[in-house]
Regions:
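FMN-binding flavodoxin-like domain, especially the glycine-rich phosphate-binding loop
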Residues: 45, 51-181
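Generic detector of short, locally flexible boundary/turn motifs and exposed helical patches
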Residues: 8-15, 35-39, 62-66, 142
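Structured loop/turn residues at secondary-structure junctions
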Residues: 9, 50-51
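Short, charged N-terminal beta->alpha structural module
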Residues: 1-30
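A short beta-strand-loop structural module common to alpha/beta enzyme folds
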Residues: 27-49, 72-75
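Secondary-structure transition/capping residues
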Residues: 25, 29-32, 174-178
């Protein structure tokens, strides 16, 4: 039975989603840094973590202490086909169910080195513009570049729907998880 939502958030977007989900599922949400003080080892949880350079932050540590039933990860990129498969590959997720949500950028909350990494990401995404002009970048990539340069949020409650659908199917199999939706 899933008992809690554990999350790691750097600038607040993952935390915001965790709070939304906590309300919808009537489950407590807890920052990963407090999981050991708050929960017994081995309980079943949903893990939510922001993506930093393709890696889901805090996941490995949480996996050592808790039993993770599903992972929700929050990033800035617009997902392309194969995106989830790549996340599986980079994070050794085996057969864990993984869901991706778009968060946002708050430049004022980032360290200098984090800004540098993001600037490089933006430069790479915007590279085709140098060769072929503005028409050569997709709208989705343009939005990401713009968010990286000026901050932006993609957080909305509807983004949780795919996960909620999965969660409901799980609770039909296991009636002890009773979501309050
Ligand atoms: C240093 C750095 C690296 C990042 N790498 C990725 C990445 O590889 N893929 C992605 O989709 N988003 C990436 N992002 C974007 C964050 O995952 C995104 O801003 C997310 O919403 C942050 O969530 P938080 O506010 O909970 O920390 C990166 C952000 C930073 C600062």
């Amino acid at each position: 039975m899933i008992e809690a939502i554990i999350y790691e958030s750097n600038t607040g977007f993952t935390e915001k989603y965790a709070q939304m989900l906590s309300k919808k599922l009537n489950l407590p949400s807890c920052p990963a840094g407090k999981m050991k003080k708050t929960f017994s080892p081995g309980i079943e949880v949903i893990y939510m973590g922001w993506i930093c350079d393709k890696r889901i932050r805090g996941l490995e540590k949480a996996q050592k202490y808790l039993r993770i039933e599903a992972v929700i990860t929050v990033g800035i990129l617009s997902p392309t086909p194969g995106f989830i498969a790549l996340l599986h590959q980079y994070n050794d997720l085996m057969d864990l169910p993984v869901f991706y949500l778009r968060g946002g950028i708050r430049r004022e909350k980032l360290s200098i080195s984090q800004k540098l990494i993001l600037n490089l990401m933006a430069k790479k995404l915007a590279a085709p513009v140098k060769r072929g002009g503005l028409d050569s970048i997709s709208n989705a990539d343009y939005q990401v570049v713009d968010s990286i340069l000026h901050s932006n949020s993609f957080v909305k409650e509807q983004n949780l729907e795919e996960f909620l659908f999965w969660y409901r199917t799980q609770t039909e199999v296991n009636p002890y998880n009773k979501p309050v939706i």
